[in-house]
């Protein structure tokens, strides 16, 4: 009798595990707080040894994925617009400008483990397109004679890793990280002279939140 009960319990657990799985044909939606932390560098500006520096920002991050097989998925990363202060040590100016950007990123991912696993770590690689908007110099920048800021959009490679842990048949918690190659050219004027500066933003993106599969 005890052996029978144990067998039934094991089968119940296995059935529950299968129900909890990410599996072929599932759509996966994730949401959470996403922090963009630039690993930035730039050419020298205005003939000095100083660089432009892009500050971090945190917004709502969203992803939508589709399980092509039990182990392979396609995912799109989106977010509400990120807003970044741009600063420089040139002349002790500090923050001189700001910009907003959206970073849609398209990933192909591999999930480790079996379809019935509640814990699914994954890695991925793909491509990012970042477009900048509402860029401009603030009062400090304008006071220093700077104007007409324009940032070129960027195409670059991306890599990520993450892990999902199923709470029940549909809901799970998630933690993930991306490294994104973002390079832009900043065009601007100092007085009447035009300048261009290459800026490598190359951010780490950290997201923690939850998700739903259907």
Residue positions per predicted region:
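Cleavable N-terminal export/targeting peptides
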Residues: 1-25
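Gram-negative (and chloroplast) outer-membrane scaffold detector with strong preference
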Residues: 22-26, 35, 39, 65-139, ...
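N-terminal targeting signals for Sec/Tat export/insertion, comprising classic cleavable signal peptides
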Residues: 30-56, 60
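Outer-membrane beta-barrel translocator domains and adjoining extracellular loop/strand segments
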Residues: 41-48, 85-93, 133-145, 185-194
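Short, conserved structural micro-motifs that define repeat-unit consensus positions
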Residues: 63-67, 172-174
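Predominantly the C-terminal beta-signal and adjacent terminal strand-loop region
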Residues: 83-87, 98, 168-214
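A charged, solvent-exposed segment within the mature domains of Sec-exported extracytoplasmic proteins
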Residues: 122-174
